[in-house]
């Protein structure tokens, strides 16, 4: 990080929060990030851009599914080739994350994957944060977007991108919270959790299919009656 970076961050803060007429470098400016198909804007594009420029990354999201992995697969594979290391923390909350996606993420040699075990359904895990570090500067996207195709590309999602030095209070607070969750005893490594989680996930899907079938039969009986 150089003094010029500090100057650019100051300009970015002025433009974002004081006067939008200030001339600043967009790479150093806080931004509102959403999906807008009319303008061809996607949250995915912002995340891919930060991934391709960062020295390391950390992600904490409640839900990861197959489509979300597919959206980011080529970018993540490129980072694997370049040796850019990352950490991804998700959860078994509501048993939503798909084992397929978790298997694929864990197969990437540059990524550490953990899952936070929610003991109490009334104390959920619903984070959505993407942290990118480059030359002593953090760019952090926080908001409503999980790692799913709809969240990253089509849903109405609201997110903000923060820009901060490592010494900035905002970056420090967010990084410390990620580290706290990452090191929590309830955060289990992929190898520790995946087989148990797979069984629970498959059982849930079987129950959901049974409920749908029973509902379909009930509707047919109502029509006959």
Residue spans of the language-model regions?
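PLD/PLD-like phosphodiesterase catalytic module centered on the HKD motif
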Residues: 1-225
């Amino acid at each position: 990080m150089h003094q010029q970076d500090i100057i650019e961050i100051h300009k970015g803060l002025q433009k974002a929060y004081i006067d939008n007429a200030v001339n600043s470098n967009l790479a150093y400016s806080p931004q509102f990030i959403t999906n807008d198909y009319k303008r061809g804007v996607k949250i995915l594009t912002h995340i891919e851009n930060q991934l391709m420029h960062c020295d390391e990354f950390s992600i904490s999201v409640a839900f990861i599914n197959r489509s979300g992995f597919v959206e980011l697969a080529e970018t993540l594979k490129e980072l694997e080739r370049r040796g850019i290391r990352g950490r991804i923390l998700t959860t078994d909350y509501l048993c939503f994350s798909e084992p397929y996606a978790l298997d694929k993420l864990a197969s990437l040699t540059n990524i550490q994957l953990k899952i936070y075990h929610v003991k109490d359904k009334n104390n959920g895990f619903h984070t959505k944060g993407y942290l990118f570090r480059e030359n002593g500067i953090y760019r952090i996207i926080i908001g409503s977007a999980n790692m799913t195709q709809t969240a990253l590309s089509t849903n109405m999602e609201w997110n903000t991108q923060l820009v901060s030095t490592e010494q900035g209070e905002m970056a420090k607070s967010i990084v410390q919270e990620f580290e706290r969750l990452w090191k929590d005893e309830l955060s289990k490594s992929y190898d520790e959790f995946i087989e148990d989680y797979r069984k629970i996930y498959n059982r849930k899907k079987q129950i959901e299919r049974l409920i749908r079938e029973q509902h379909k039969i009930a509707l047919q009986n109502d029509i006959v009656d």
